[in-house]
Amino acid sequence: MSIVTKSIVNADAEARYLSPGELDRIKSFVTSGERRVRIAETMTGARERIIKEAGNQLFQKRPDVVSPGGNAYGEEMTATCLRDLDYYLRLITYGIVAGDVTPIEEIGVVGVREMYKSLGTPIEAVAEGVRAMKSVATSLLSGEDAAEAGAYFDYLIGAMS
């Protein structure tokens, strides 16, 4: 839920106008909107590069994943692994645009540990893939933008730990 929606819901629940503090937070949210959109555009435009480089980093760091018997062994399973990374990158861009982790939490984190466990996929490897995406994606952004985006990657990594 965005800061705007949260503020309105809270104020309405108390049958009051928005407080000066709530209005300041909304102003800050609106002011930072252009930056959040720019970050999401950069990451979306570079998504193939981010996924490819992150996948390469993951497979170098975790060769067990692509070795015979590994969850990403073979062309089809490697493609599935990269598809999952793409899915998480997309969720991160949603969170960045929203200025909130709620889209990541509600769409992608609930049940993720159980799902990967049932598939026999080591969640640590998935988290490592997200770390690799963070490294690639933030290298494409300016310092302030990289810090903003990095927080959403960190949230997802933490949720997987």
Swiss-Prot record:
It comes from Arthrospira platensis. Its main location: membrane. Contains one covalently linked phycocyanobilin chromophore. (2R,3E)-phycocyanobilin binds at residue 81. CDD domains: APC_alpha. It is a peripheral membrane protein. Component of the phycobilisome. Heterodimer of an alpha and a beta chain. Coiled coil: none annotated. Pfam families: Phycobilisome. GO terms for biological process: photosynthesis. The modification N4-methylasparagine is found at residue 71. It is found in: Cellular thylakoid membrane. The keyword Transport applies. Keywords: Antenna complex, Bile pigment, Chromophore, Electron transport, Membrane, Methylation, Photosynthesis, Phycobilisome, Thylakoid, Transport. This is Allophycocyanin alpha chain.
